[in-house]
Amino acid sequence: SKLEIGKCRYGLMLNEDGMVYDDGVTTRLGENHYIMTTTTGGAANVLNKLEDYLQTEWPELDVYLTTVTDHFSTISICGPNSKKIVNKMIPDLDLSDQNFPHMSFKNSSINGVRCRVMRISFTGEHSYEINIQSNYAKNVWEMSMEAGKEYNITPYGTETMHLLRAEKGFIITGQDTDGTLTPVDLQMDWIV
């Protein structure tokens, strides 16, 4: 409840021994509505552990967990022109730093299709992640490529993403961790 509606927070998932097993971003969508992202490969494990904790550690909580992994696609637009590109795609969304600071989200729409736009970054660059129903992802992808043409937009893959995040000191669980590291070992004691 400390996370304000419309805000996002990066977090680590720890085993009972305090070792890091996953990470992700939790966003507060409404008074009692959150969405949590995880690593792609860790989603099922995180959901299982949260369900276990709800039954064994927090049975008094009135919380329901639902996986929506296959319902949404995410298109990340990064770099120095990301704001201009997103503005062309969603012209009525105020992207000013005052209205849309880092680690926040806004509900919006692209050509009448509802979406969530998050100002978060795994690359360390100025970025927006557009969450859209999966059946619209191809169309929104094509729109983003068209909107970015004048800025020489270029798709990037996981190898580029890994290099960019490494330059910023961001971890990849399972690659930079092996189940034997705590947040302190990773020099991330600021998160504890």
Language-model regions, residue ranges each:
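Acidic, proline/glycine-enriched N-terminal capping motif
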Residues: 1-13, 19
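Short secondary-structure transition/capping motifs
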Residues: 2, 15, 35-39
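Glycine-rich, Trp-frequent "lid" loop and neighboring beta-strands that shape
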Residues: 25
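Conserved, structured C-terminal
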Residues: 29-192
